[in-house]
Amino acid sequence: MTITNTVNLTTELDLPAYLFGITMLLIVMLVHGFVLLQIAKRYEVKSFLYLSEQKYSSVALVFYISILCLFLTHLFEIILWGISLRVFNLLPNLGQSILFSGSTYTAMGFMDDSLPNGWKMLAIIIAFSGMFAFAWTASVMISMTKNFRQAYTLLHMQKLKLPTEVIERFK
């Protein structure tokens, strides 16, 4: 087997894409996990305090701010993928790199596969990173809704002027 055959085999199997993709997937998931846990921790503490202080509208505000932060986390990860594609000169410009990353990360696939030969598998790895990140985010959002729903219900109980003993039983 000659060097040319080895290079062709490496390219045909997309080995550089696997190595680069798995490394980036790990980096993206580490960033995602760190930021996600920070958002969740801050939401849980603040919403618990606001519930205990009967500041039910503040719980909703913190909930929506947390959702915005989760969204921004995903945007950051798409940009991180885009920058990495551009740094490795896999796409012609940063804008196209970010757009391609977003298209694959969200699994929407609205862009053509413009990656060079030997790097095609990278699109699938980016899609997996997005699926993993969205699943993790969804699980955190589900846990966040408990305090949000409790605050929402308590706020409406107060607006309906239900007796205090009824409201206290709900807590």
Regions found by a protein language model. Name each.
Residues 44-57:
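Membrane interface segments of multi-pass transport proteins and intramembrane proteases
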Residues 54-63, 104-118:
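Short membrane-interface loop/juxtamembrane segments of multi-pass integral membrane proteins
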Residues 1-16:
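Short, strongly hydrophobic alpha-helical membrane anchors
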Residues 56-76:
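Interfacial helix-start motif at the membrane-water boundary
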